[in-house]
């Protein structure tokens, strides 16, 4: 049953969500059923709560080349929400999305009052949206997608780190400043004509300084080389009444500001997020002041993390089997015994049940192998950065040389992850 939040009379109601990552797998396991249930729930939440504006702040898909099934879920949802009470849908691209893929059907979607902003445009009006209801303006939206390096910096070569950080910050700040100035002028013009001050809402897909990452395995990627967490909240003009952010998967206020928010991902993207509430945000504007409430998203697939010795793991699994649980589990063995057949033992124990062990880590055996064979590494447990760190260690690279090499490597990674393969 979808919860219903009381809506003030004459208020403009906005629903803020982000980071769906449609098509994302968890240790190879498809999650389409979960995504489908979430999107069905979201349509119900929109209708039950009389939502006027839906904002999706980036990372609609998990990859730039989404599967046919992921695309089907996306377009089915848009078809459903177009028939709902929601008057306006605004979707901006995140760093996982292909800007050209999202933008491709925008002309058709415009006819359904669905505005898609996949990439930065030279035309300021493409990112500055004026929303109307009954032929009267009701809100201004500064709809900014993820700003790629080429959008905000003239140079993309291997500059020194400080110059790159400075140029990145200045590029982002300039982009928001330009849009904010136009939005404020538009707001004033509307006030003079209609004698009503309407709210200014901005979107962003970036990492603002002081924000807290939900976990190390939630699928987030570094956005800007060397500047992770260094984009200050001060880039948002004080005239902006609400900032709808995406990228970070934990719902939170930014810099203790009630009006600058990450809504977080609606589903746990990794076992590190187990037990953390997932939500979308409801924002009511009776004038230009936002009143923010959260709406909890149900858990559509139970995820469980079990860590400890064999006795603890065995007891926990037996309890799940006893309760006929339908759960996906991650098991981390940290006992004193080596237990080389741990994976086989667990698979046999769970055979025929609805408990699925997606990831089994034998930390004890792994550490023993590391002690006896330092070069034996489990790539499954290493990030791209960890692999490069191991290479630097193997080559005995000095501490003085490492920052420049890491900077170059991160630049290459960023280019790989943000290159739009559909762009001509």
Placement of each model-derived feature along the sequence:
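A short helix->loop->beta-strand "cap" motif at the edges of active sites that frequently abuts
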Residues: 83-89, 198, 258
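His/Asp/Glu-rich metal-coordinating catalytic cores
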Residues: 66, 97-257
């Amino acid at each position: 049953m979808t919860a219903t939040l009381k809506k003030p009379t004459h208020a403009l109601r906005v629903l803020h969500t982000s980071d769906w990552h449609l098509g994302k797998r968890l240790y190879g396991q498809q999650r389409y059923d979960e995504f489908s249930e979430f999107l069905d729930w979201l349509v119900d939440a929109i209708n039950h709560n009389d939502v006027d504006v839906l904002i999706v702040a980036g990372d609609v898909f998990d990859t730039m080349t989404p599967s046919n099934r992921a695309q089907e879920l996306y377009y089915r949802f848009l078809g459903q929400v177009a028939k709902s009470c929601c008057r306006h849908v605004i979707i901006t691209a995140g760093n996982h999305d292909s800007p050209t893929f999202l933008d491709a059907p925008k002309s058709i979607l415009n006819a359904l009052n669905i505005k898609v902003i996949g990439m930065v445009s030279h035309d300021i009006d493409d990112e500055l949206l004026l929303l109307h209801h009954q032929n009267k303006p009701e809100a201004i939206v500064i709809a900014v997608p993820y700003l790629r390096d080429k959008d905000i910096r003239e140079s993309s070569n291997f500059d020194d780190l400080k110059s790159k950080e400075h140029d990145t910050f200045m590029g982002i700040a300039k982009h928001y400043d330009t849009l904010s100035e136009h939005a404020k002028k538009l707001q004033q013009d509307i006030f003079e004509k209609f004698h009503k001050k309407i709210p200014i809402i901005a979107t962003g897909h970036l990492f603002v300084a002081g924000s807290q990452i939900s976990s190390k395995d939630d699928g987030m990627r570094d956005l800007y080389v060397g500047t992770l967490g260094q984009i200050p909240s001060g880039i948002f003009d004080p005239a902006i009444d609400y900032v709808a952010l995406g990228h970070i998967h934990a719902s939170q206020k930014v810099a203790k500001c009630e009006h600058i928010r990450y809504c977080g991902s609606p589903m746990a993207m990794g076992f590190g997020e187990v037990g953390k509430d997932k939500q979308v945000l409801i924002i009511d504007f009776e004038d230009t002041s936002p009143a923010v409430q959260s709406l909890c998203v149900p858990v559509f697939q139970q995820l469980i993390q079990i860590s400890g010795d064999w006795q603890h793991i065995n007891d926990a699994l037996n309890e799940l089997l006893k309760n006929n649980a339908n759960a996906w589990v991650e098991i981390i063995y940290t006992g004193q015994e080596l237990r080389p057949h741990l994976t086989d033992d667990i698979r046999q124990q769970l055979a025929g049940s609805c408990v699925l062990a997606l990831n089994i880590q034998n930390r004890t055996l792994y550490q023993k192998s590391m002690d006896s064979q330092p070069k034996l590494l489990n790539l499954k447990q290493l990030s791209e950065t960890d692999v490069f760190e191991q290479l630097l260690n193997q080559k005995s690279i000095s501490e003085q040389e490492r920052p420049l090499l890491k900077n170059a490597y991160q630049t290459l990674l960023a280019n790989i992850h943000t290159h739009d393969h559909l762009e001509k």
